[in-house]
From Swiss-Prot:
Name of the top EC class for this enzyme: transferase
InterPro entries: UDP-ManNAcA_Trfase_WecG, WecG_TagA_CpsF
Pathway info: Bacterial outer membrane biogenesis; enterobacterial common antigen biosynthesis
EC number: 2.4.1.180
A Pfam family the protein falls into: Glyco_tran_WecG
A Gene Ontology biological process term: enterobacterial common antigen biosynthetic process
Family statement: Belongs to the glycosyltransferase 26 family.
Job of this protein: Catalyzes the synthesis of Und-PP-GlcNAc-ManNAcA (Lipid II), the second lipid-linked intermediate involved in enterobacterial common antigen (ECA) synthesis.
Keyword set, alphabetical order: Glycosyltransferase, Transferase
Gene Ontology MF terms: lipopolysaccharide N-acetylmannosaminouronosyltransferase activity
Protein name: UDP-N-acetyl-D-mannosaminuronic acid transferase
Species in which this protein is naturally found: Salmonella agona (strain SL483)
Length: 246
């Protein structure tokens, strides 16, 4: 019998990644025995592995996160190459966030949202309440000063949130989650980048057929040509992959 409450770990470039078989496995793992896990979720793709390689502070942030999972198809392929028996699939961060919100709405789990433009955040809250009856106990847009951080952490703690999602981009969101956990440790934190923009329709995500083919990165590149310099960096990751330097 398959144990959905457990998941193997696979190491890439010295970072242990959770090997989820699919979205159902991910949710059952995070809500094992009816208890939501506590810690930090970090989506790992090739670009994030490259950044971790070059930036010791980012690497330390990622290494400290309890739940690092394969968000990028290239990372999934590298795991399968290094560990041929691995039963691991891509769990896209945007999809995991939506599934987590749907589950939270079903179970009444208190949620605090951080990040995004004020209007996008307001639309995200409204849609979450309408679509899944999510119990949103507080929110804060991404426009706050460093001096306001401690007040934000105090608000999150006072809210009793069990899920805190932060849309500020990497590594800002990882830094904020790390610091907030010192004040409010008993929650599941998730960095979600631009997910609120996608969820509310302000940014168009790749069609499902592109996602299923593992070409979401190419769709984003064609839609946003300025990303080309970021994609060129990935040649280094391809060298790691094809030379087995994983």
């Amino acid at each position: 019998m398959t144990n959905n409450a457990a998941a193997p770990l696979y190491s890439l470039r010295g970072l242990p990644l959770i090997g989820w078989r699919d979205m159902s496995h991910a949710l059952n793992y995070l809500f094992a025995d009816g208890q939501l896990k506590q810690g930090t979720l970090v989506a790992i793709n090739a670009e994030k592995l490259l950044t971790a390689e070059d930036n010791p502070e980012v690497r330390a942030l990622i290494a400290a996160a309890e739940f690092k999972y394969a968000d990028g198809i290239s990372v999934v392929r590298s795991i399968r190459k290094k560990f041929p028996q691995a039963q691991v699939s891509r769990v896209a961060g945007a999809d995991l966030w939506e599934a987590l919100m749907a589950r939270a709405g079903k179970e009444g789990t208190p949620v605090f949202l951080v990040g995004g433009k004020p209007e996008v955040l307001a639309q995200t809250e409204a849609k979450l309440r309408t679509q899944w009856n999510v119990n949103i106990v507080g929110s804060q847009d991404g426009y706050f000063t460093p001096e306001q951080r401690q007040a934000l952490f105090a608000r999150i703690h006072a809210s009793g949130a069990k899920i805190v999602t932060v849309a500020m981009g990497s590594p800002k969101q990882e830094l904020l989650m790390r610091d907030c956990r010192e004040v409010h440790p008993h929650a599941l934190y998730m960095g979600v980048g631009g997910t609120y923009d996608v969820f509310t329709g302000h940014v168009k995500r790749a069609p499902k057929i592109w996602q299923n083919l593992g070409l979401e990165w190419l769709y984003r590149l064609l839609s946003q040509p300025k990303r080309i310099t970021r994609q060129v960096r990935l040649l280094r990751y391809l060298r790691w992959h094809y030379t087995g330097d994983l």
